[in-house]
A protein has these predicted regions:
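Surface-exposed acidic/polar loop and edge beta-strand patches at domain peripheries
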Residues: 1-126, 134-163
Length: 163
């Protein structure tokens, strides 16, 4: 599902799949966000969790209270290819949420909740990440990050080299 926030300056769109930005368009119709091209990179602005980047051979060892567990983590983590739940929406703000599930627990043995809040004010988009460890007795290592890609060149009379 695609959800939009609009004001007098921008229209910003988001996808519940991945909980990510999918469009940033000015009132003049200029698209700022990369729209994806499978020839180069089909992504737009994925949310990376519980890792940013890759791990050696895709394999991670977790040192838990009850022993060592091995898991497989794909590049940039587990949530960028999952459906998020829309928890809140106003005319200028929305909040997505995702939690651990049986599939994520197989390779990342921590019960978590991730909330991503997007807020549009004027020409600014504020993104706030909130990560919750739902197990109080187990330390939960993680990274979280955004990976937005911006369109370049923006205008028809520009070249990539202009940037």
């Amino acid at each position: 599902m695609v959800i939009a926030l609009k004001n007098d300056d921008l229209e910003v769109q988001f996808k519940t799949f991945g909980g990510e930005l999918s469009s940033i368009r000015s009132k003049e119709g200029i698209e700022y966000l990369w729209q994806g091209d499978p020839e180069y990179w089909s992504g737009q602005a994925p949310v990376l969790f519980p890792i940013c980047g890759s791990v050696r051979n895709g394999q991670v060892q977790y040192h838990l209270k009850d022993g060592v567990k091995t898991g497989q983590l794909p590049r940039h983590g587990l949530i960028r290819k999952r459906e998020f739940e829309l928890k809140e929406q106003t005319d200028h703000r929305l909040v997505f949420e995702i939690t651990s599930n049986d599939e994520s627990l197989q390779n990342y043995p921590y019960h978590f909740r991730v909330e991503i809040a997007y807020e549009l004010k004027g020409k600014e988009i504020t993104i706030t990440y909130r990560v919750q460890n739902l197990e109080s007795d187990q330390v939960m290592p993680y990274f979280i990050g955004g990976h937005p890609a911006f369109r370049c060149p923006l205008l028809a009379d520009e070249d990539y080299e202009d940037y």
